[in-house]
């Protein structure tokens, strides 16, 4: 038994997952420390505003991915393996289209954000904080693009090294702001959303200067964007990203400026932190799924993926079992309600990790993102409609039940679609 475990750990996939997981959890530690620090400086209502604005920034950065993540993981690993001459053309094209579309959306947001905040988000944040939030979106988009490219090239160590060095510098900056009493919503968003990504890119540029120059010189070729595949996954991923934030946005709508938004925002951040472990695993598994050719390979990758994804499933369960005093220790009793909210959310997310297996298969093996679009649309509608009716009655404890139901319904769709597509795969290599 011990020998099998050691052999499992020694596999290249396991090593990459260990590297990526350690890196992601260093990032998690920084995020936890930021929360640990900020809840001691900011009032719950102020932290609630920060949670909403950062949530908007993160959601928009994911929206403005435009499905390029799927293209990068589907095609870049094969291009690198075969030393394809279009590697830099591919990277330049993806970056150019993504940036161009992002600038259009960000410009519209700059114009309408104050109005949207007034009628929907109701944070009452000053205009300059809204504008800093808007500009931070583009920097997050560029950082995500670079991280995806590094991961697709299996440069997991470097991606995590640069990200966590930028986290270290952000920590120093925030601590430096404390004596000047300059820690507020605006300065935190500026530090997280603009300075952090800038540091990341500077570190990457110094080490990969030759690649930067080749990408700059490469032409933009429209066919490399793969619009049909990319656009479908883009729409699908946006429904899911919005679903994960819709609970907080609707809480902000119904419970404007209430401390409960701060409690829930902190709980959501804890859950999203655990979800980082899922990303660290799927980022490594994705290239493997893109190379599947037979049913035996499907079974093999599902088996491997299932073992790895039991880790975040176990983390959600451990989070549910965590004593309340642990939450009080890290976040103070000022945020005491966070403990119960986090436990409720952890149960809701318990089945989510394993749902990534059929998702990876459909996206990278079958290359049929339309099924993911259907699943994510159901998840989004369930969360949006469910939270709209449960929040006025149950407050912050309404969304966890709705999220659990949404994952179940979305999972059923993914499972049925996977079985349907599996039947099309040849049993053995031809």
Where are these predicted regions, by residue range?
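Membrane-water interface segments that mark the loop-to-transmembrane alpha-helix transition
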Residues: 16-27, 53, 65-114, 295-316, ...
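Interfacial segments at transmembrane-helix termini and the short loops linking adjacent helices
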Residues: 14, 113-133, 258, 321-351
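Signature of the first transmembrane helix
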Residues: 12-69, 106, 110, 136, ...
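Interhelical loop/hinge segments that connect adjacent transmembrane helices in multipass membrane
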Residues: 1-13, 185-190, 201-244, 291-297, ...
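Hydrophobic alpha-helical transmembrane segments
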Residues: 52, 127, 131, 160-211, ...
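Helix-loop junctions and terminal segments of transmembrane helices
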Residues: 65-81, 152, 248, 271-295, ...
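Interfacial/gating helices of multi-pass transporter permease domains
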Residues: 38-59, 126-127, 222-229, 233, ...
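Membrane-interface junctions at transmembrane-helix termini in multi-pass inner-membrane proteins
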Residues: 139-162, 290, 349-375
